Amino acid sequence: MYDVIVVGAGHAGCEAALAVARGGLHCLLITSDLSAVARMSCNPAIGGVAKGQITREIDALGGEMGKAIDATGIQFRMLNRSKGPAMHSPRAQADKTQYSLYMRRIVEHEPNIDLLQDTVIGVSANSGKFSSVTVRSGRAIQAKAAILACGTFLNGLIHIGMDHFPGGRSTAEPPVEGLTESLASLGFSFGRLKTGTPPRIDSRSVDYTIVTEQPGDVDPVPFSFSSTSVANRNLVSCYLTKTTEKTHDILRTGFDRSPLFTGKVQGVGPRYCPSIEDKISRFPDKSSHHIFLEPEGTDTVEMYVNGFSTSLPEDIQIAGLRSIPGLEEAKMIRPGYAIEYDFFHPWQIRSTMETRPVENLFFAGQINGTSGYEEAAAQGLMAGINAVRKILGKELIVLGRDQAYIGVLIDDLITKETKEPYRMFTSSAEHRLILRHDNADLRLRKIGYDCNLVSSDDLHRTESIIKRVQHCLEVMKTAKVTPAEINTLLMNKGLQELKTPARALSLIKRPGISLQDILEHSLSVRSAAEELCNDPRVAEQVQIEIKYEGYIKREQLVADRIARLDSLHIPDNFNYDSLNSLSSEGREKLLKHRPATIGQASRILGVSPSDVSILMIRLGR
């Protein structure tokens, strides 16, 4: 008998299987196609706004995604550099073929993982506890626990114009049938969602004299805290163009054959990644929409047309593409399409990713109603971590909203009603100034180490950074900068000059003055804080802590108040019907979601502050 079975070898499944295996347990990873491990079915990129933060958190906890993109990325950029550090988000174009091969190689070389190419069509449970999965051949495979990471394969249906046919992730991959019905028989509630992808074009058919080049960063920041650099700095550029009124007119002629507008598609699509026809319909006054041309690798001519997701008929797609500046001669290699699939309402999972209806069964990824490689990988990692800890009888790991974007993601899934594919934004995190990409290891490395996913060397390196940052902050509080050292710089910057020596910390707080300015002009500060000159990581943390000290302290106070509510646990079998004073909607939502804490209860839509107060009184809090 296996310890854990992981169903699906996408981004969630790979992280789940690796977490189980590296946690010391024997894992069986089942996938319908071993050549499609960690396949990038949509955009050829990792990271981006909020997603980059999640990727760095995955790495900090000991996951593989960050290392994979550092090894196979072909262009790296830090987004939102002009904004504050809370908004900085790393993003990389991937060679999607190499990314998949990298992850397959990592999975295959993990001794605690066995691989099986087959399709799971059923799940069995005994007395409410997971017992086995059934594969297409009819064989039942037993394990102590299972993690389902099925992606968009559950009863998948692909739409291109008025044509529709079964498909799991692309037009070449079959759906999974029977598994939804099997889970429904165990008491699970499911729904239907939709996502889509744009056409791919031949990069040789683009007129590069018209489109705007977007090169990568000269000195990119790696995703993994274990990487000192990325393997390939800037092998490719991306390109920017935009649709025109002519494009919109052409696409409108196909609306009568659009599955989106004719009612063929029943699933709800992603609000923040709408199809091009949806954008034209929703924003009729907008004369253009940005289009980003993204290479899919260094050994292919395929180019991803970001911003042009569509399920319109093929003839309309190609005509619309050729009306875009720079794409007048575009050759379409693959059409865009929409895909409908089953998902399971995430109020049925706990904060640990374990399902409520069936013990020792975990869900991760798009089966929970999320979108995005990074969101899926994060769920897979947490499901893998907690499956191991459940089997070993250890305390399960729940990340708070003040600890990680991953904690925000999982909490949102449980407390919010998922009516469309969920994706993460920085605006989703109320504590984003303390959940920056640059400090993910400082926040989460110890947890990864405790889960046997982070080496002692990596942990010691992180602990060393924390100590040195604290030392340097103390130096900045006491070290003095003289007028003779700094006044010329202040005068050149149009800032008030010093009349007496000032603390380095107070000078750095001034707009227009950086930590580097102080180090370059003050020998005494430089001598006292030598680490700042030698380690960019330490210098970065010190500057942020000083510049944003007031904001960080204020945010931490709010986070601490919320954390106190999240520390007040509600028994799993709590009888809400015994509280006559609860509002009817509040009682209904509490019974449905079964929050684990008072804090979680307070975030459920429909649960009022009065309901929360009644709960706290009953629980003696």
From Swiss-Prot:
Annotated Pfam families: GIDA, GIDA_C_1st, SAM_GIDA_C
Named cofactor requirement(s): FAD
Example GO molecular function: flavin adenine dinucleotide binding
Gene Ontology biological process terms, A to Z: tRNA methylation; tRNA wobble uridine modification
Superkingdom per UniProt: Bacteria
Binding site for FAD: G8, A9, G10, H11, A12, G13, V120, Q366
Subcellular location: Cytoplasm
GO CC entries: cytosol
UniProt xrefs under SUPFAM superfamilies: FAD/NAD(P)-binding domain (SSF51905)
InterPro entries: FAD/NAD-bd_sf, GIDA_C_N, MnmG, MnmG-rel, MnmG-rel_CS, MnmG_C, MnmG_C_subdom, MnmG_C_subdom_sf
Alphabetical UniProt keywords: Cytoplasm, FAD, Flavoprotein, NAD, tRNA processing
Binding site for NAD(+): 269-283
Subunit description: Homodimer. Heterotetramer of two MnmE and two MnmG subunits.
Database matches in HAMAP family: MnmG_GidA
Family of the protein in this entry: Belongs to the MnmG family.
Its biological purpose: NAD-binding protein involved in the addition of a carboxymethylaminomethyl (cmnm) group at the wobble position (U34) of certain tRNAs, forming tRNA-cmnm(5)s(2)U34.
Protein name: tRNA uridine 5-carboxymethylaminomethyl modification enzyme MnmG
Organism classification: Bacteria, Pseudomonadati, Chlorobiota, Chlorobiia, Chlorobiales
Gene for this chain: mnmG
